[in-house]
């Protein structure tokens, strides 16, 4: 029989928020007796946008903005019904996107 595994992917704009969320997930899963691998930091995606500062004069004057998306990966092995219930009941901040597979 194949071992049951849950893969949790976290995405957020704030690095402190994603690290706190990952630690709370790991702590709640370890209480149920499951094995945890992670949080594994994935590459940060950076999107840069360049805009012109003024609409008419100084066309060479530009300003750059960037948006960073931080990602973490957590693998959970030996999943029990208590593990899934603890993940369902876990309250995470609004700025963190969670994907379960």
Curated annotation (Swiss-Prot):
GO molecular function, one term: tRNA binding
InterPro entries tied to this protein: Ribosomal_uS10 (IPR001848), Ribosomal_uS10_CS (IPR018268), Ribosomal_uS10_dom (IPR027486), Ribosomal_uS10_dom_sf (IPR036838)
GO cellular component, one term: ribonucleoprotein complex
Keyword terms of this UniProt record: Ribonucleoprotein, Ribosomal protein
PROSITE patterns in the record: RIBOSOMAL_S10
UniProt record, GO biological process: translation
Gene3D superfamilies in the cross-refs: Ribosomal protein S10 domain
NCBIfam families to which the protein is assigned, alphabetical: PRK00596.1 (NF001861), rpsJ_bact (TIGR01049)
Family listed: Belongs to the universal ribosomal protein uS10 family.
Protein purpose: Involved in the binding of tRNA to the ribosomes.
Subunit structure: Part of the 30S ribosomal subunit.
Protein name: Small ribosomal subunit protein uS10
Native source species: Brachyspira pilosicoli
Taxonomic path: Bacteria, Pseudomonadati, Spirochaetota, Spirochaetia, Brachyspirales
Gene responsible for this protein: rpsJ
């Amino acid at each position: 029989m194949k071992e049951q595994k849950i893969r949790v992917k976290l995405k957020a704009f704030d690095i402190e928020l994603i690290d706190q969320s990952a630690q709370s997930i790991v702590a709640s899963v370890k209480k149920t007796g499951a094995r945890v691998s992670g949080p594994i930091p994935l590459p940060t995606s950076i999107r840069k946008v360049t805009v012109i500062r003024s609409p008419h004069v100084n066309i060479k004057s530009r300003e750059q903005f960037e948006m960073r998306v931080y990602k973490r990966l957590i693998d959970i092995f030996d999943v029990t019904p208590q593990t899934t219930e603890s993940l369902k009941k876990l309250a995470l901040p609004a700025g963190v996107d969670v994907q379960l597979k």
